[in-house]
Swiss-Prot record:
This is Uncharacterized serine protease YyxA. It comes from Bacillus subtilis (strain 168). The active site is at 129 (charge relay system), 159 (charge relay system), 243 (charge relay system). Its main location: membrane. The lineage of its organism: Bacteria, Bacillati, Bacillota, Bacilli, Bacillales. Residues 283-383 form the PDZ domain. The gene is yyxA. Belongs to the peptidase S1C family. GO terms for molecular function: serine-type endopeptidase activity. The chain crosses the membrane at residues 22-42. It is an enzyme of class 3 (hydrolase). It comes from the Bacteria.
Length: 400
């Protein structure tokens, strides 16, 4: 029997042909989707600088790129303050005779602040060290012009001086603010002429780093601090030419007169400014008297800590428990101290109820009093404690 194998025909179903209309719809949908996606992502590409289409649109008909001008407003509180106050901050030029022939030249320059004006005169406050030794002083105004200035008075202890100029060219006057209200962290602006008049009207900004800082000052040049200057500390850049310039609060008020800069190689510079509460009474005295009228004792002093310890017992005869005080090294017989009976080698340990640690302490308490005040002074003489009442006077009353 013969078996026949049956071949099965396997056929693939014929696919229906797409019409031209189908192709068109697919293409149209793809174009729409692509357009939507591009519209969505183009702003992001533009922000990243990849919007080539935008670049093409900035080209003119000659294929060159055009430049757009963008106006940005930069007016803020600082720029307004600077605009208003810059004309009130001036340059101060110290002119000295430089040789035996009497020729004069600029010995240095600093800054100053115009704080008062009347029909005839305007007054400028600056630092004593800026005008020290000057045979002639000039003021450089904001427009670059110079006017001659007269020295009204100066005070070495506070490092302040007052100048007077004719008022016809003065356009702006600064107002003082209350430095007692200044807080650490408060923003401030410094205006001055760092490193000379080439950088006139320079502006720096910072904050108050600290208030009531005490900086030792050697007022008589003997190499020993005899006074602590109370200053504001700021991180606003203050360079040597800034001396006498203004430290402003955000109300545009002068809260300090820039005076010193402490700079060390390992730290940032520290800007220091004399607070307005101390500036105002000094310049008022300088205007009125040409000097500051302070109460004085009429003695030369040295801190006990600066005296060799073996003298404490052998020469001064001090008890073992007395380790601080101010030693009287000399007395004017007609001074308040001389009239009260203080003598050389007396050791002052208490002034007006306050302990005296050294001569800095004593001067601090003394300058807080007024001419005419009476104070009680305790001291040691020959190992015994004594006390006297002293009526304070000013130096110009000596002998009266």
């Amino acid at each position: 029997m013969v078996d026949y194998e049956r071949e099965e025909e396997h056929t693939t179903p014929e696919q229906p042909k797409r019409s031209k209309k189908g192709y068109f719809l697919s293409s149209l949908i793809g174009v729409i989707v692509g357009a939507v996606l591009m519209a969505f992502i183009m702003p992001y590409l533009s922000n990243e600088g990849l919007d080539t289409g935008a670049l093409d649109q900035q080209q003119n008909n000659n294929g060159r790129e055009s430049i757009r001008t963008v106006n940005v407003s930069v007016n803020n509180a600082v720029t307004k303050i600077v605009s208003n106050m810059s004309p009130a901050v001036v340059g101060v030029v110290n002119i000295q005779k430089s040789d035996i022939w009497g020729e004069s030249g600029e010995a240095g320059s600093g800054s100053g602040v115009i704080y008062k004006k009347n029909d005839h005169s305007a007054y400028v406050v600056t630092n004593h060290h800026v005008i020290e030794g000057a045979s002639q002083i000039e003021i450089s105004l904001k427009d670059g012009s110079r006017v001659s200035a007269d020295l009204v008075g100066s005070d070495q202890l506070m490092d302040l001086a007052v100048l007077r100029v004719k008022s016809d060219k003065i356009k702006a006057v600064a107002d003082f603010g209350n430095s007692d209200k200044v807080k650490s962290g408060e923003p401030v602006i410094a205006i001055g002429n760092p490193l000379g008049l080439e950088f006139a009207g320079s502006v720096t900004q910072g904050v108050i780093s600290g208030t009531e800082r005490a900086i030792p000052v050697d007022s008589n040049g003997d190499g020993q601090p005899d006074w602590n200057a109370e200053v504001l500390q700021t991180d606003a850049a203050i360079n040597p030419g800034n001396s006498g310039g203004a430290l402003l609060n955000m109300d545009g008020k002068v809260i300090g007169i820039n005076s010193m800069k402490i700079a060390e190689s390992a730290v940032e510079g520290i800007g220091l400014s004399i607070p307005s509460k101390l500036v105002i009474p000094v310049i008022e005295d300088l205007e009125r008297y040409g000097k500051v009228k302070r109460p004085f004792l009429g003695i030369e002093m040295k801190s006990l800590s600066d005296i060799a310890s073996y003298h404490w017992d052998e020469t001064l005869k001090l008890p073992k428990n007395v380790t601080n005080g101010a030693v009287v090294m000399g007395v004017d017989a007609f001074s308040p101290a001389g009239k009260a009976g203080l003598k050389e080698l007396d050791v002052i340990t208490e002034f007006d109820g306050y302990k005296v640690n050294d001569i800095v302490d004593l001067r601090k308490r003394l300058y807080q009093k007024k001419v005419g005040d009476r104070v009680k002074v305790k001291f040691y003489r020959g190992g015994k404690e004594k006390s006297v009442d002293i009526k304070l006077s000013s130096a110009d009353q000596l002998g009266s």
